[in-house]
């Protein structure tokens, strides 16, 4: 029997995803037409022995989360529960705090995955890989190859090339350690809790010595990467399964468009029915496009490649949309143009207006390049990135919004370039 745990974080996390995370918890943001988390849940539900999926985070239970959970349970016919942490306990602290719920029913193994990654989720391959190593005490990290420079932004894994054992693990090293990076997807057996428990006890001893008033809470904050993997490396217990299939983090809003492209591409294999096709009297599409059935699109509009159109969106005559996500209820009036942008819920773009951003894609000439997490400002200037309109933004006719971030509920009256409009 298997279980899966998805770590969804909380409202203090995902700040780089603002202003989109103001309206909806980041894990529920739609990527390729469905909430980010749904891709994880679907991959888990396809495993034959999967009995339960647990979401762990510190969001207050809210209507959106509850609605998503009840819909997902019906769609995937699997038990899905949300366990709320009382505070941010770290990637290891959360699963240790809820260890009784994870272990109830006696699972042989369980997956732990971060919500903010997009991947093909090679979960069956990870299970086979663990069986090949034949040791029920072994734990598996999903790894992939990055280029030397970008590897410094991730957890780096030094492996034994013959056995795939993790010999050394360093989280975000200061100098180059290895080009194999941690993908944030793990396969554990219940024995992992012994290792987390010993770190917890060690933390408690240190707290007692320090005589801190909030020592109990601090002892429970445990990070899988720094506290557990670093200690387990080289002990014959930790292995890395390397994948060459697509994988990316979804940290910034710009990376959501890139993740959307990867998932839309995957739909050819997994969900061809989700991809729009050119039909007589329908909108013209180029490349991979997702259109929600409730969207109203003029047949003279041209969409794609890499576009997803949400519920109740209205798109007028002669509109051009490319490399963008258009969210619920937005209106794109006649002859407007949207490139490399995310248009927020219920926003309106006037006639002949142009909303354009700069793509933050990985270097296409480097097969191992990952998406860069650019800082918001460089040399005192806003780094060019995709344009984001928060919810309920009104763009008047015939203006240009370029490389800008517009916070919710703004009525603009002129063009803007390289600005954050508060």
UniProtKB/Swiss-Prot annotation:
Keywords: GTP-binding, Nucleotide-binding, Nucleotidyltransferase, Transferase. One of its GO terms (biological process) is GDP-mannose biosynthetic process. Residues 2-253 are annotated as: Substrate-binding domain. InterPro entries: GMPPB_C, Hexapep_transf_CS, Mannose-1P_guanyltransferase, NTP_transferase_dom, Nucleotide-diphossugar_trans. GO terms for molecular function: GTP binding; mannose-1-phosphate guanylyltransferase (GTP) activity. GO terms for cellular component: cytoplasm. It comes from the Eukaryota. GDP-alpha-D-mannose binds at residues 85, 249. Residues 275-422 are annotated as: Hexapeptide repeat domain. Residues 358-386 are annotated as: C-loop. Disruption phenotype: Morpholino knockdown of both gmppaa and gmppab results in muscle damage and shortened motor neurons. Pathway: Nucleotide-sugar biosynthesis; GDP-alpha-D-mannose biosynthesis; GDP-alpha-D-mannose from alpha-D-mannose 1-phosphate (GTP route): step 1/1. Regulatory subunit of the GMPPA-GMPPB mannose-1-phosphate guanylyltransferase complex; reduces the catalytic activity of GMPPB when part of the complex. Mediates allosteric feedback inhibition of GMPPB catalytic activity upon binding GDP-alpha-D-mannose. Together with GMPPB regulates GDP-alpha-D-mannose levels. One of two paralogs (gmppaa and gmppab) that may have redundant functions. Component of the GMPPA-GMPPB mannose-1-phosphate guanylyltransferase complex composed of 4 gmppa subunits and 8 gmppb subunits; the complex is organized into three layers, a central layer made up of 2 gmppa dimers sandwiched between two layers each made up of 2 gmppb dimers. Belongs to the transferase hexapeptide repeat family. The N-terminal substrate-binding domain adopts a Rossman-like fold and has a binding pocket for GTP or GDP-alpha-D-mannose. The C-terminal domain consists of a series of tandem hexapeptide repeats that adopt a beta-helix conformation. The beta-helix forms several protein interaction surfaces involved in assembly of the GMPPA-GMPPB mannose-1-phosphate guanylyltransferase complex. A loop extending from the C-terminal domain (C-loop) is involved in interaction with other subunits of the GMPPA-GMPPB complex and may be involved in allosteric inhibition of gmppb catalytic activity by gmppa. This is Mannose-1-phosphate guanylyltransferase regulatory subunit alpha-A. It comes from Danio rerio.
């Amino acid at each position: 029997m298997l279980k899966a745990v998805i770590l969804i974080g909380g409202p203090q996390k995902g700040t780089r995803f603002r202003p989109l995370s103001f309206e909806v918890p980041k894990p529920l943001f739609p990527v390729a037409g469905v909430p980010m988390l749904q891709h994880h849940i679907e991959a888990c539900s396809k495993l034959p022995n999967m009995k339960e999926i647990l979401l762990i985070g510190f969001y207050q239970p809210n209507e959106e989360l509850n609605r998503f959970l009840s819909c997902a349970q019906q769609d995937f016919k699997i038990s899905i529960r949300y366990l709320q942490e009382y505070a941010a306990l770290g990637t290891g602290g959360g699963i240790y705090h809820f260890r009784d719920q994870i272990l109830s029913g006696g699972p042989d193994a369980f997956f732990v995955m971060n919500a903010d990654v997009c991947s093909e989720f090679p979960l069956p391959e990870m299970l086979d890989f663990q069986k090949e190593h034949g040791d029920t005490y072994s734990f598996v990290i999903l790894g992939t190859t990055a280029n030397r420079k970008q590897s410094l932004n991730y957890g780096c894994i030094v492996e034994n090339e013959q056995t795939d054992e993790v010999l050394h693990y360093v989280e975000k090293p200061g100098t180059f350690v290895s080009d194999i990076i941690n993908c944030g997807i793990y396969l554990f057996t219940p024995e992992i809790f012994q290792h987390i428990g010993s770190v917890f006890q060690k933390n408690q001893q240190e707290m007692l010595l320090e005589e801190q008033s909030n020592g109990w809470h601090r002892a429970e904050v445990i990070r899988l990467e720094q506290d557990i993997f670093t200690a387990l490396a080289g002990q014959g217990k930790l292995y890395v399964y390397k994948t060459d299939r697509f994988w990316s983090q979804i940290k910034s809003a710009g990376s959501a468009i890139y993740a959307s492209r990867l998932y839309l591409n995957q739909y050819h294999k997994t969900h061809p029915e989700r991809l729009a096709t050119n039909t007589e009297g329908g909108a013209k599409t180029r490349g991979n496009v997702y259109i929600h059935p409730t969207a109203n699109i003029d047949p003279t509009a041209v969409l794609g490649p890499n576009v997803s159109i949400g519920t109740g969106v209205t798109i007028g005559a002669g509109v051009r949309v490319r490399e963008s996500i258009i969210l619920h209820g937005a209106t794109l009036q006649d002859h407007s143009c949207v490139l490399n942008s995310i248009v927020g819920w219920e926003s309106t773009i006037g006639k002949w207006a142009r909303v354009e951003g700069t793509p933050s894609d990985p270097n296409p000439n480097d097969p191992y390049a990952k998406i860069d997490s650019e800082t918001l400002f460089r040399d005192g200037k806003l780094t060019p990135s995709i344009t984001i309109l928060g919810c309920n933004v009104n763009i008047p006719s015939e203006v240009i919004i370029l490389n800008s971030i517009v916070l919710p509920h703004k009525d603009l009256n002129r063009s803007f370039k390289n600005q954050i409009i508060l």
